[in-house]
Amino acid sequence: MLLAAAPLVAQKPTPKRSPPPAARADTATRRSDSTAAPKDSLTRFLESFSFRNLGPAAYSGRVTALAVPRTGGYSKTFYIGAAGGGVWKTSNGGITWQSVSEGLGVQTIGDLAVAPSDTNVVWAGTGEKNSLRSQWWGDGVYKSNDGGRKWTNMGLKDTRSIGRVVIHPTNPDIVYIAALGHLWGTNPERGVFKTTDGGKTWAKVLFVDDTTGFVDLEMDPSNPEVLYAAAWHRLRWGGSHMQGVGKGSGLYKTTDGGKTWTRLTDPARKNGLPTERLGRIGLAVATQDPKIVYATVQVDRGVTDPLQGRYGGVFRSSDGGATWSQVNDLQAIPHYYYDDIFIDPGNPDHVWTVSPSLLESKDGGKSFAPDSMHLVHGDYHALWIDPGDPQHLIVGNDGGVYVSRDGGKAWEHMAIPIGQFYTVIVDSSLTPYQICGGLQDNGVWCGPSRTRDTLGITDGDWYPVNGGDGMWVQIPANDPYTVYSGWQYGHLSRLDLKTWQRDDITPLALDAGQDSGYPYNWGWTTPILVSQHDATVLYLGANHLIRMTHRGDDWDVLGPDMTRASREHPAPEVAHTSYHAVFTIAESPRSKDVLWTGSDDGLVWVTRDGGKTWAEVSASFPKGAPTDCWVATIAASYHVESRAYLVYDCHHRDDYGPHVYRTEDLGKTWVEIGKGLPSDQGSLTVFEDPVNQRLLWVGTATGAYVTLDGGKSWRRLGKNLPNVPVESMALSFAQRDLVVSTHGRGVWVTNVGPLEQMTDTLLAEPIHLFDVAPAYQYRPRDTYPDWGSGPFVAPNPPRGAVITYYLKEMEPDGVKLVVTTAAGDTIRHLTGPGYPGVQRVTWDLTRDKPRPRELGGPTSRDDLKRVASGQYVVRLSLRKRQLERRIDVQDWPADRLGRLH
């Protein structure tokens, strides 16, 4: 089962100093438990659901920032910032890592900085600067005074994206912020900001226009009054590639701490820098000789395809920016994704730049050579060079963090679970169920929901089934050996897990008059859906809906063009990312003939006869509905054939509100049901429970939300799920586990069986005993790894049967439970906590006393205490009430797929 989840304004290049009224920092202090408002029963109930993070971390995710305290020697402490996974810290040189960003409102990081004069002071700028099609928005800048343990939001919330944070070398209260502003729209809160009071107030000291922000900012290490700032005109529109060049882009310098600025790319200066059609600029100032400044400059001379030629390159100044010379025409492509340059602190001629490869120059940028990056992921974004040892390097790329201690000849990967999942499914035909999902630039991976190992679930338990940018994946319910998976722009393969035979089944030209190749318009993420009614049929979304039969060997097109491509929204300048494509597909679990599609430009179609005829129902939404946004998810109801749920994701239109709808009549009318969701976290996916039709889940840009009343009210689910985008959800039918994929912190799992059993009256009852999920009996497999402390290990769920009950009031003596055989023989006594709310007790599938030995049977005490598979009953007695539930104990299944546990 798989569920998914404006015209440009004229530019004014003249910089304007426009300090606005002082902006106050949002302290966001948390009340202590003694003063907090009392929690209602439902809040306590929902907070009791704790998620397990399964990773994986074999490949991590995009790392955008590195920050290492200046200690005067080798630093064992450093921080990394992830595109979607928050801030992580190591205090032992990278052996182990700890997430320190749970106090942040979002987990997308643009830059990090540690105060040189006080290494406890750490700043985090939220909102990635790389302007990727799948990036998320920030909510300003945060400050920690205790090395990342606690954070305070210091304002600038509407900047949405931070390019650089620069801290004064001797005064930690003086901080500069290079803010890019909104990626998907125009806004005035962008530019260079300065605080002199530690972030309590801010002044905007440099501003160009409401489409131009600042992507880089560098300080002269010998004079903190001298700074260089790189302005970047950028704007994405809808689903397209961005417009990344414009009159606002340029290079600026101040010599008085931001009071006045000089535009170094002014054509009148004739100083050797390019001055027209500028794009992204990266900057670096030499530590040993601060008069030496490098700039990587993107220049577009009218080329409309960003993957083709660009004119610009690496420029160097030896006089503090007065004059420049082009030393190399090297430019990383595409420029919206890379453009930073780094200088060896001990040698201004030793320069590194990032691109799909890590490039090194030893002659001042005249020539670059790719570093030896064997067995290292590509696409680089951050680099730190040890001032005391230039052989010691740390890099951040799309695969995570790597450390080298020999100048880049060999690298060590840091295991940090910051994977950026687009989709997730569960394969319930295997027991325990398997989880598969596609990750940004890290392929498609599958792994177990639990193992027999006492250690837990390791990265070795996961296995890749595809490469590239991992997208959608499907496994037929009746064939766990076949995996269909896709990668960017419509590519599709079929993998046989028994033989590892892979077949490319991407649809090519259908008509004799068409050229071979890809005649359809594929989106970046192409949806794939295996029919619930016929496992040999797949559906694939392009600008048409494509039906694939015979396991993908044949295909035909169902219906018309299901996008606005032929009607409106012409692709804007520099349109690289494909647009006008089906983004979500749904099939009714109750009828194979009812199919839905939703496109990335807002169209919704439905058929009730298997695709013979279609109705476009986009105009049926209530007035004010954002019907030109991405249709992120359509979920057909498990309970009513004519019912469906729909989510619009509008952040690509600079709209960050939730947009969730329901239809009861195949799209003829729709009602909005997302009004109780947070107003600034968007909406990404919706999921209807197959047991309880009033139970819905929604994924937002900062977590998962649940409604128990069909959408009238919403609550956040769980306490420990990070504030991270939830793009997809799936449910294990046997275990009643909700599997959540996040775009930045990997996969998370929680059991939602008690939620499915919720009723209006349950919370008013003094006590309730919930149904118990099947439990597995097995001998734990002891593992004795000697690989050290570094590898990531995810916890298994508790071994045994998890018994869940609800108490309305405190029971000082706790709760007594008894386990019996189906025949009524008592075999185990248990005691559970008596606190109000939802409580859990795990029966470890053993008896109170070992059973008698039998001839030829087991002899160890552990084996004699262990119960056999079969039916058992748990009974809870309290205050003259007695409740009982069945427990199904199953043997651990035979290993049907040899590589799985």
Role assignments for model-derived ranges:
Residues 627, 826-866:
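Glycine-centered tight-turn motifs at strand-turn-strand junctions
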Residues 1-11:
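Sec-dependent N-terminal signal peptides
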Residues 529, 804-806, 818, 844, ...:
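Residue-level recognition of well-ordered beta-strand positions that form the cores
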Residues 878-901:
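C-terminal tail/sorting-segment detector
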Residues 240, 247, 855-870, 893-895:
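Glycine/proline-rich low-complexity spacer/linker segments in large multi-domain proteins
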Residues 12-791, 798-801, 806, 810:
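Beta-propeller blade termini and top-face loops
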Residues 493-495, 803-804, 811-824, 828-829, ...:
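Beta-strand-rich binding/interaction modules
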Residues 798-804, 838-840, 882-884:
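Intrinsic-disorder/low-complexity, polar/charged segments enriched in Ser/Thr/Lys/Arg/Asp/Glu/Gln
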